[in-house]
Amino acid sequence: MTINVESATAPRWPDVVAAFGLRGSNPDSCWCQRFREHDESSNRAALRRELDEAEIPVGLLAYVSDQPAGWTRVVPRRTLAGICGNRALQRVLDDNDSAWWVTCVTIRKEHRGLGVGRALLDAAANHARDNGASVLDGHPVDTDRLKAKPSPSALFSGTLAMFEAAGFHEVARTYPSRPVMRMTLG
């Protein structure tokens, strides 16, 4: 089994759709738009437009044996109104124009537990570093602190274990089960 990660560019749109799995058939699913503001008719259309217009790719695609297996959005934090405007996050984050953010780590069901999330986070760190980021942050779920087993959709932002395995460290918590994780890219 080989895991490769590539930039999510406009020509790879069919692979983006495939990476989203069953959610890919619903244009009103999140489509990695939860923390953005847009004026498109659907979230799917908004992501498509982003890929079409992006000078720097806004996401990465993971492939397992050449099949689309996962997606992550990795962009400058300042471009995410839902992150910058979040009061809980404002209390723990510094003002850093060169900080980037991983909003989601989506992995198709059949590829979970194979290291796809780690591969996406490793590639996200390289992508952010290559584009001038000083730090890369994320807000995963600490599944050990949950009272019940979460649904897969509740883990869209990744897990604490996944971020730790990729070399991120905890800088704060906004809730007992929600650490803010950081990788310094210096």
Task: Go through the PLM ranges and name each one.
Residues 129-134, 142-172:
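Conserved active-site alpha-helix within GNAT-family acetyltransferase domains
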Residues 63-65, 183-186:
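Active-site beta-strand termini and strand-to-loop segments that position acidic
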Residues 102-107, 113-130:
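Conserved acetyl-CoA-binding loop-helix of GNAT-fold acetyltransferases
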Residues 102, 136-138:
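Conserved hydrophobic beta-strand within the GNAT/NAT acetyltransferase core sheet
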Residues 57, 176-181:
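Short hydrophobic/aromatic beta-strand or adjacent loop that forms the aromatic wall/cage
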Residues 1-37:
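Conserved N-terminal entry element of GNAT/NAT acetyltransferase domains
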Residues 30-59:
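Active-site rim helix/loop that mediates acceptor-substrate recognition in acyltransferases
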